[in-house]
């Protein structure tokens, strides 16, 4: 094709006229030093606290210390390729992670990137990891139950949707097991679960994923993993990333449950970053703002009202409340709940489930200490039938523990004390539950009803759990309609109670305790 000179000049003129002029204005700085993932930068006069910075090699960092003549930043990931003299650019953005239903069923890192080998996640939306928690006016009181499927928790320390309930205990006391049971129990309830693993071994996280897949719970779960081998910065931001993913569901009028496993390791990662940034250390060498680290995270778990959901969705969702329930986990050292981080988180949350090593080793699992475990707001959210039948459980256990201590010294006990001890022993036995064997509201109510009616008084303590399991199987087979009615209404009617009394009578008559 021949072009004459005048056509060439016309083409060039047209190109020049249509050129999109857009000079990029970005503040640049220079790396002064790199040590342990902390970068000191000269320049960047306009940088903001928490702003994302771009390093060479498509690496990003967070500006954390804004000083007179330098900026202290933490690198998100590998930093070996960054060296003195490298150029750093401000991005003008704060850190965002992908959010939405596309993440459900996937395992992602602290930045929301998939690490499960199942291909990319094509999320339509992203959200900043740091957000201000809903205000008082936007909230609604906690009044709907978040069933864990564990008898001891749902009867003594109930959790409501939008609550923050701390799970606290030494290592190897079953903290993660309680949280996983709560996640598995949400199957079919329409609750999206987020499990945030901070500072754990990659093998432990792989085991959690396998267990959730086995029990069909990965279909409603997102896993955010920041393993022990990853940078402290990623362990520090992982809970905030998980929270942003949960907030998406809360803000569209759905219910979500988030487990932070565990916040002790996040505090340690934050302490490491702060000390490397040369921030002044305080108690236990933690920085002064370690309380704020957890309070700004846990305050984002809330139940928001219909008006707020309508406002956040632009009127697309009407008449629905949304909730984000948090189960933070804290690991104690030798049962010391008065240490710095445990006391902080206890004061932030709406109650705690305290797990004890002695109970765990004695075979009482979940190893819940009924005396100091409380739920400050969950009582209002408890299912009617469980509230009615489970009221005496905590009292029976507390009295049993007290009397058992005295009974060691006293040889001759009166009849009333002996009865109380026997009752407490049976209740303690019945509160035991194997992992991954969660119960529905009706099945739980059945056990509590039988305890209240004194049906276990002539059952040997060692046989109580076997008797309970067989009676449940019998009712499931012959009176499934009663269980369905209790699950649907959340209450036990007088007629259904008569049916259960007859069922118990006939079952006991044909039951052999040998």
From Swiss-Prot:
EC category name: translocase
GO molecular-function term, one example from the UniProt record: ATP binding
Annotated CDD domains: ATP-synt_F1_alpha_C, ATP-synt_F1_alpha_N, F1-ATPase_alpha_CD
Superkingdom classification of source: Bacteria
InterPro entries reported for this sequence: ATP_synth_asu-like_sf, ATP_synth_asu_C, ATP_synth_asu_C_sf, ATP_synth_F1_a_nt-bd_dom, ATP_synth_F1_asu, ATPase_a/bsu_AS, ATPase_F1/V1/A1_a/bsu_N, ATPase_F1/V1/A1_a/bsu_N_sf
Binding site for ATP: 169-176
Keyword Secreted in annotation: no
Substrates-to-products reaction catalysed: ATP + H2O + 4 H(+)(in) = ADP + phosphate + 5 H(+)(out)
EC number of this enzyme: 7.1.2.2
Membrane topology recorded in Swiss-Prot or TrEMBL: Peripheral membrane protein
Alphabetically ordered keywords of this record: ATP synthesis, ATP-binding, Cell inner membrane, Cell membrane, CF(1), Hydrogen ion transport, Ion transport, Membrane, Nucleotide-binding, Translocase, Transport
GO CC, any one term: plasma membrane
Similarity section: Belongs to the ATPase alpha/beta chains family.
HAMAP family per the UniProt record, alphabetical: ATP_synth_alpha_bact
Quaternary structure and interacting proteins, as annotated: F-type ATPases have 2 components, CF(1) - the catalytic core - and CF(0) - the membrane proton channel. CF(1) has five subunits: alpha(3), beta(3), gamma(1), delta(1), epsilon(1). CF(0) has three main subunits: a(1), b(2) and c(9-12). The alpha and beta chains form an alternating ring which encloses part of the gamma chain. CF(1) is attached to CF(0) by a central stalk formed by the gamma and epsilon chains, while a peripheral stalk is formed by the delta and b chains.
Name this polypeptide is given: ATP synthase subunit alpha
Gene: atpA
């Amino acid at each position: 094709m021949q072009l004459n000179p005048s056509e060439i000049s016309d083409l060039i003129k047209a190109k020049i006229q249509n050129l999109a002029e857009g000079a990029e204005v970005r503040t640049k700085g220079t790396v002064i030093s790199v040590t342990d993932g902390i970068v000191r930068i000269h320049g960047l006069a306009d940088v903001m606290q928490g702003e994302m910075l771009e390093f060479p090699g498509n690496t990003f960092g967070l500006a954390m210390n804004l000083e007179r003549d330098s900026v202290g930043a933490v690198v998100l990931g590998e930093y070996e390729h960054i060296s003195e003299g490298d150029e750093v650019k401000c991005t003008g953005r704060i850190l965002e992670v992908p959010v939405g239903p596309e993440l459900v069923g996937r395992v992602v890192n602290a930045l929301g990137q998939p690490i499960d080998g199942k291909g990319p996640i094509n999320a339509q939306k992203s959200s900043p990891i740091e957000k201000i928690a809903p205000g008082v006016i936007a909230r609604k009181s906690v009044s709907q139950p978040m069933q864990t499927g564990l008898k001891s928790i749902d009867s003594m320390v109930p959790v409501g949707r939008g609550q923050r309930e701390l799970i606290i205990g030494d290592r190897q006391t079953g903290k993660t097991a309680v949280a996983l049971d709560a996640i598995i129990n949400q199957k079919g309830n329409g609750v999206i679960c987020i499990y945030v693993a901070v500072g754990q071994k990659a093998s432990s996280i792989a085991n959690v994923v396998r267990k959730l897949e086995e029990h069909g719970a990965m279909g409603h779960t997102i896993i955010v993993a920041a393993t022990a081998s990853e940078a402290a910065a990623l362990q520090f931001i992982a809970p905030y990333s998980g929270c942003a993913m949960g907030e998406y569901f809360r803000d569209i009028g759905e219910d979500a449950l988030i487990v932070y496993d565990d916040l002790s390791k996040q505090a340690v990662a934050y302490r490491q970053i702060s000390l490397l940034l040369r921030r002044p250390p305080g108690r236990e060498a933690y920085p002064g703002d370690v309380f704020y680290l957890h309070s700004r995270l846990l305050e984002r778990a809330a139940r928001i009202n219909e008006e707020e959901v309508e406002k956040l969705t632009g009127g697309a969702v009407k008449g629905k409340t949304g909730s984000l329930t948090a189960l933070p986990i804290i690991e104690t050292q030798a049962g010391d709940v008065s240490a710095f981080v445990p006391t902080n988180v206890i004061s932030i949350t709406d109650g705690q489930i305290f797990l004890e090593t002695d109970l765990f080793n004695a075979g009482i699992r979940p190893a819940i200490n009924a005396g100091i475990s409380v739920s400050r707001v969950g009582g209002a959210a408890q299912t009617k039938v469980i509230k009615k039948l489970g009221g005496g459980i905590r009292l029976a256990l507390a009295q049993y523990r007290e009397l058992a201590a005295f009974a060691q010294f006293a040889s001759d006990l009166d009849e009333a004390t002996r009865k109380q001890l026997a009752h407490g022993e049976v209740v303690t036995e019945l509160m035991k539950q194997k992992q991954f064997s969660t119960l529905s509201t009706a099945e739980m109510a059945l056990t509590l009803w039988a305890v209240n009616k004194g049906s276990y008084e002539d059952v040997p303590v060692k046989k109580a759990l076997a008797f309970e399991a067989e009676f449940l199987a019998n009712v499931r087979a012959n009176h499934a309609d009663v269980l369905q009615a209790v699950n649907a209404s959340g209450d036990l009617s007088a007629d259904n109670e008569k049916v259960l009394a007859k069922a118990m009578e006939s079952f006991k008559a044909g039951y052999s305790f040998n």
